[in-house]
């Protein structure tokens, strides 16, 4: 019986890792062992940062809403605005509110006025 070698399989596995490491600096894109480590670390960062991205966007939306609310009404703060929205029964999430504040300031001002009337 012929000896089974895994040349094609090993080559394909190495090629997959080295293709993933394309563009990395120095040996990280050329040497299989260091490329494997670099790709593994990159995947760890990617997994972690998918979770972090959600937090960052929520913080950004809150900052934008706060700035827009204060621009419309100097007395109103973000927390008072959110409480007033809940009291008014307006169920709009922060992403939509931030988008309104940036792209349609008149509509956002109307929402602020409606929330203030309910508060």
UniProtKB/Swiss-Prot annotation:
A cellular component term from Gene Ontology for this protein is:
ribonucleoprotein complex
Which Pfam family, any one of them, does this sequence belong to?
Ribosomal_L20
UniProt keyword terms in alphabetical order: Ribonucleoprotein, Ribosomal protein, RNA-binding, rRNA-binding
GO MF terms listed in the record are: rRNA binding; structural constituent of ribosome
**Biological-process GO terms, alphabetical:** ribosomal large subunit assembly; translation
Output the InterPro entries linked to this UniProt entry: Ribosomal_bL20, RIBOSOMAL_L20_CS, Ribosomal_protein_bL20_C
Q: Which SUPFAM superfamilies match?
A: Ribosomal protein L20 (SSF74731)
User: Family, per the entry?
Assistant: Belongs to the bacterial ribosomal protein bL20 family.
Q: Which NCBIfam families match?
A: rplT_bact (TIGR01032)
PANTHER family of this UniProt entry?
39S RIBOSOMAL PROTEIN L20
Role played: Binds directly to 23S ribosomal RNA and is necessary for the in vitro assembly process of the 50S ribosomal subunit. It is not involved in the protein synthesizing functions of that subunit.
Q: What's the protein here called?
A: Large ribosomal subunit protein bL20
Identify the coding gene.
rplT
